[in-house]
Amino acid sequence: MASKKVQKIRDKRKARVRAKISGSTERPRLSVFRSSKHIYVQAVADNEGKTIAHSSTISDDVKSKITDVKKVEAAKEVGRSISRKLRDMGIQEVVFDRGSYLYHGRVKALADGAREEGLKF
C-alpha cells in the first residue's frame, strides 16, 4: 500500500477530479481503478447511479488476449474491450475519470486503447 503521504495526495487529487466531472446515460463516466497486478474500468451513469458496462484484465474476453504481455499492453486491450462494449450499446462519447491516478503509463494506455476503437473523450 502507498504511504500515508502518497495516499493523502491521491485522495485530494481524486476529490478534485471528481468535483469537475459527472456522467450521464448518454455520456457515461469511464472510471479507472488500478491495482498492482490488474486494471479495471467501468462506465457509470451518475444520474442513475448504475454501472453500464465494465471490463478488466481478469475479464474472460480480455484474459485470453493478454497472456505473456506487459501490464501497459494489457491496459490497452482493456480500453479496446470497454470501447467495443459501449459501441455495441450505441454510446460514442464518455467522460474519462482517471480517479487519483496520474494520466501516465497504464491509465494513459487504457485511454489510448479506447480511442483506437473509436470512443471519444
UniProtKB/Swiss-Prot annotation:
Subunit architecture: Part of the 50S ribosomal subunit; part of the 5S rRNA/L5/L18/L25 subcomplex. Contacts the 5S and 23S rRNAs.
Family membership: Belongs to the universal ribosomal protein uL18 family.
NCBIfam families recorded: L18_bact (TIGR00060)
Protein name, per record: Large ribosomal subunit protein uL18
Pfam family, one: Ribosomal_L18p
Keywords of the record: Ribonucleoprotein, Ribosomal protein, RNA-binding, rRNA-binding
HAMAP family: Ribosomal_uL18_B
Protein's organism: Syntrophus aciditrophicus (strain SB)
GO biological process, alphabetically ordered: translation
Entry-linked CDD domains: Ribosomal_L18_L5e (cd00432)
Region listing for Disordered, in residue ranges: 1-23
GO CC entries: cytosolic large ribosomal subunit
MF term (GO), any: structural constituent of ribosome
